[in-house]
Amino acid sequence: LLYLVERQIRIVFESYQAASRLNVSRGQALEFANLARCLERMMDHVNNLTTFIIEHNEHIPRLNLTPPIQKLPLWQESLKELMLNIRTQDSHRIETARRQLKTLQTELKVYEHSIFEDEKKNRQMASSLSISESVRRLCAYSRDFGEVLLNMKLASVMAEVRDR
């Protein structure tokens, strides 16, 4: 249900009439639509992860020890920071969260490459790779989310300067 609501929010913000009714500029509405699109893509990956875990619960004990699962709390922390900054728009905090997400992405990429080195674990390799890719994509979409927030802040500052 939440997934459908997020998609509808994105569609609403892409409408110029909706922007007018919400008393936001067309540019702001497009940025909010971009935020909604990032959330929508993250939900796709979370849905994939959930489906995988439900269908392959025999892997759960081993998965808890893998870097992708261990990195999820750091991703959640960074995304939470970005979500809080929808309102506060603290550039330094947004950029710190984006840097943490980039570090997580890099570490997960290294992990994914290391999986291929041990061919004995083909089945575990496939599941670990799938989960790692989803967590890495969650980090990427969260970084995009942060970039949109920075763009929104910059537009707001530029509008203030212009209106003086």
Which residue ranges define each predicted feature?
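Cytosolic, long alpha-helical scaffolding segments
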Residues: 1-164
